[in-house]
């Protein structure tokens, strides 16, 4: 079990454990437009939905998970949290979910499966969770276009090397980047991840860099400020 300040995440049944990417997305995603409805696509343990339940007063926080064991785990984590009345997990793939959309969402978040590299681990479950063929970027962006409310935003974390491709695809659906944060492990390491927010409304795109640590377990003040509401030791 992974314990945060206001909730805990059981992760024994799912291949995707709590990791820096999920925590970053959950903590960084802008909420200044006061979302009432939120959708977490590919919820895994439910971590990001739980973080957004803590950060927002959204009355409807839906999560979507295709893997049965992860779905069960996310449901348990939601029920055991202080916000169980606002959280709900659907056991479905994105393609099924968008066939009959019942709601629009003010915020859609996704930590999509990646590793386009041709490599397999010994765990089929982990491969499903990590492979971009499990959820192509096109499918995610098209779904966001269908499901976002007029002033809604899409927030994702992806490998930095995929950023240009993702932005180009989003533009085809008239979704435009309004905030980009590029993430580096240390000041001298290469950029590993991109945090991106898209809107239907074109505006100046705010861009910055986030460095996680200056030395092993010596976190930058920016990273501490971002995550201190969640990590027990921050």
Swiss-Prot record:
Catalyzed chemical reaction(s): adenosine(37) in tRNA1(Val) + S-adenosyl-L-methionine = N(6)-methyladenosine(37) in tRNA1(Val) + S-adenosyl-L-homocysteine + H(+)
Compartment annotation: Cytoplasm
Example GO biological process: methylation
Primary localization class, coarse: cytoplasm
EC number: 2.1.1.223
Enzyme class: transferase
UniProt key word RNA-binding: no
Pfam families, per database record: MTS (PF05175)
GO cellular component: cytoplasm
Annotated Gene3D superfamilies: Vaccinia Virus protein VP39
Listed name of the protein: tRNA1(Val) (adenine(37)-N6)-methyltransferase
Species for this entry: Flavobacterium psychrophilum (strain ATCC 49511 / DSM 21280 / CIP 103535 / JIP02/86)
Lineage, top ranks: Bacteria, Pseudomonadati, Bacteroidota, Flavobacteriia, Flavobacteriales
